[in-house]
């Protein structure tokens, strides 16, 4: 996605793995009083601490001294709802309340950050039972509490058994293996454009029951998507409409 849609000469992009779920983020934000902060400084300090706690990840954030060194912040997390058990003391309502608070807080990438949610998990990026464009994608739902079993479901039901249809390979040095054939590059980019379009349309369907590209992007804001997922899918029948956040990010980032 970076190679295909962003400035490939830009060396100022920072990608950091949080290494936990969205509810852990909420807990850490409470501990660091991030919710009471007026800018992104507290969040960056939190991420720095998490980075130091996971030495296997990059330490690139340690080089930052001030929050104003970062112009935009995007956060991507899975919905990842869980039934209460010995390992999770939060009720379903409490988990939903925390997600809603996070979506309200992270609503501007140029301020404190912009949060995007994958439903139910990031693996939804390849949940297509038919080749693109999958005309049935609008109606795909899964149990809201599917948890890690969704990965197995994607492997079993998706017509794409890997990410090759939208991704380049990686060599031993973790560098992109850019195809030599321009047609292959164009095919991957075209697939991304299709994936973006059908996720935009599905987000619109979730929010207003119209499988079409909305005239206003605000209609399919992350807050509206979440509220309608609960009202139309989770609360009535314990299901969630499959939707991926990365195509929606592309849509909003380019304003088209």
Residues covered by each model-derived region:
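Short, extreme N-terminal leader segments that mark the start of a protein/domain
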Residues: 1-24
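C-terminal accessory helical subdomains adjacent to catalytic cores in phosphodiester-
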Residues: 13-16, 26-35, 41, 51-256
């Amino acid at each position: 996605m970076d190679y295909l849609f962003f400035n490939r000469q830009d060396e100022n992009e920072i990608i950091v793995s949080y290494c936990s779920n969205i509810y852990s983020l909420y807990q850490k934000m409470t501990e660091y009083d991030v919710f009471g902060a007026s800018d992104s400084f507290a969040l960056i300090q939190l991420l720095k601490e998490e980075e130091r706690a996971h030495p296997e990840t990059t330490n690139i954030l340690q080089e930052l001294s001030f929050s104003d060194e970062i112009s935009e912040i995007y956060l991507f997390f899975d919905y990842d709802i869980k039934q209460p058990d010995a390992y999770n003391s939060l009720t379903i309502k409490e988990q939903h309340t925390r997600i809603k608070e996070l979506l309200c807080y992270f609503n501007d990438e140029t301020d404190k950050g912009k949060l995007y949610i994958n439903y139910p998990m990031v693996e939804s990026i390849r949940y297509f039972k038919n080749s693109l464009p999958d005309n049935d994608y609008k109606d795909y739902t899964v149990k809201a509490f599917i948890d890690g079993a969704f990965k197995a479901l994607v492997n079993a039901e998706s017509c794409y058994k890997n990410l090759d249809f939208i991704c380049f390979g990686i060599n031993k040095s973790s560098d992109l293996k850019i195809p030599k054939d321009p047609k292959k590059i164009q095919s991957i980019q075209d697939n991304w454009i299709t994936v973006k379009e059908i996720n935009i349309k599905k987000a619109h369907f979730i929010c207003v029951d119209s499988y079409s590209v909305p005239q206003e992007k605000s209609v399919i804001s992350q807050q509206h998507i979440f509220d309608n997922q609960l009202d139309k899918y989770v609360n009535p029948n314990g299901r969630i409409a499959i939707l991926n956040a990365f195509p929606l990010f592309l849509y909003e980032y380019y304003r088209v």
